[in-house]
Amino acid sequence: MTQSALHTEFGGIAALRDALARRQVSAVELAQSGLDAAQAASGLNAFLHIDPDLTLAQARAADAALAAGTAGPLAGIPIAHKDAFVTRGWRTTAGSKMLAGYASPFDATVVERLAEAGAVSLGKLNCDEFAMGSGNENSAYGPVRNPWDTRAVPGGSSGGSAAAVAARLVAAATGTDTGGSVRQPAALCGVSGIKPTYGTVSRYGMIAFGSSLDQAGPLAPSSRDLLELLDVMTGFDPRDATSLQACDGQANESGRVRRGHDAAQAGYDAAGSQPLKGLRIGVPQEYFGAGLAPDVAAAVDAALAQFEQLGAVRVPVSLPRTELAIPAYYVIAPAEASSNLARYDGVRYGHRAAQYGDLNEMISRSRAEGFGDEVKRRILIGTYVLSHGYYDAYYLQAQRLRRLIAQDFQRAFADQCDVIMGPVSPTVAKNIGDNRDDPTADWLADVYTLGVSLAGLPAMSVPCGFGGQDGRRPVGLQIIGNYFDEGRLLALADRYQQVTDWHQRAPVSQDA
């Protein structure tokens, strides 16, 4: 496995931008270095689609903009996109045989905005099929391997994104988070990742899984890098019905606030300029009970102790419905998935069976051949809970529970704490294939991330140590904020990363 030499030489996004501005390196050189590194690290299976001609054309355009003084804030920065975002030029498959060879006629808003800012895409990254999974083992194109230990999963569903960033193949990557799919792979691969408040980043052009839960978010080595990306990615999009418009910043009755795209930067500046003395960190007792591995607990506790040294105080809080987030999520998300994936029928686009009798057989065979086991499992669950006679008993009850989970968070933020911290995943990365006999065991790995997703809150993962038998599998600290508190979360993560070096560590080369 080979890291991009130029990328690691210059460091994060700000350092890369400075090097590009000073002509110490060109965008073409960075892009070619990244392409070479991606090829050398092909054993990780992080990339699904690479087109050097497209990448180098973007790099040449970035160099021209830099020379003309018209460059955007990310001009020449090498990134890559999760294969859940449609892209013009690169194929988009969502990790599924159903979309094998699909060519989108347009870019997703996230892709479009990053391109307008000058970022150079190295290609499309592997992911769990239709973003359904916690280990990136559900991709139709094979599992992604964790750069820290290639026997291990990278987390999912944005496993290719986390692996590419951890291996320093790219400066940053996009991901999607429905129930933890940015935070969990970020934690297991030792990088930083953030799920913004639901509605702050456009979902237009993001292949839908659970529409009331899906949210795009970036992954990068540091929180400062995340801020650079989030500043470009956020903002109202009239093409997305769930996109939030800017307003005066007053909270409504649910505690939500609608703000413009500059809110993260403003919150970051405000929080970053204040001492941490007196900051109340809520520590949910439910996050530190049975099921949490001792090595993960120790790393997270050490991170909390570091925040205490910076002046913050720990405050015990309770999120009593934490475990109930699992059944609530696995009713709501499959229900929405069964509706969203109904469009893949072999008629309009997607895989079509080669042999069939009538139209009904064509549709059923196309879906049976095109979808993998995990996707079929969730479609069946979703169809069942939405069926006549079960809708009230399951789906409506899950939605009521969702509201109660959100209220638990709001009570904690209103009366007890400023932010909430705890683990991202109950264990370090498992080995590939460990849960092959019980695929639903992966669902339990999301116990600390699902509640945040159901509530629509922002949360992030930052690397905070290592665990596992050989001590080389990363652990992530989850930082959860109130609605539209992305700036504060990023500022707190930055304060932590100023006094620790976990985010600067990269995996050593190893055979994949």
Curated annotation (Swiss-Prot):
InterPro entries: Amidase (IPR000120), Amidase_CS (IPR020556), Amidase_dom (IPR023631), AS_sf (IPR036928), GatA (IPR004412). One of its GO terms (cellular component) is glutamyl-tRNA(Gln) amidotransferase complex. GO terms for biological process: translation. PROSITE patterns: AMIDASES. GO terms for molecular function: ATP binding; glutaminyl-tRNA synthase (glutamine-hydrolyzing) activity. It holds the Pfam family Amidase. It comes from the Bacteria. The keyword RNA-binding does not apply. The active site is at K82 (charge relay system), S157 (charge relay system), S181 (acyl-ester intermediate). The keyword Protein biosynthesis applies. Its EC number is 6.3.5.7. It catalyses: L-glutamyl-tRNA(Gln) + L-glutamine + ATP + H2O = L-glutaminyl-tRNA(Gln) + L-glutamate + ADP + phosphate + H(+). Gene3D superfamilies: Amidase signature (AS) domain (3.90.1300.10). Keywords: ATP-binding, Ligase, Nucleotide-binding, Protein biosynthesis. PANTHER family: GLUTAMYL-TRNA(GLN) AMIDOTRANSFERASE SUBUNIT A (PTHR11895:SF151), TRANSAMIDASE (PTHR11895). Heterotrimer of A, B and C subunits. Belongs to the amidase family. GatA subfamily. Allows the formation of correctly charged Gln-tRNA(Gln) through the transamidation of misacylated Glu-tRNA(Gln) in organisms which lack glutaminyl-tRNA synthetase. The reaction takes place in the presence of glutamine and ATP through an activated gamma-phospho-Glu-tRNA(Gln). This is Glutamyl-tRNA(Gln) amidotransferase subunit A.
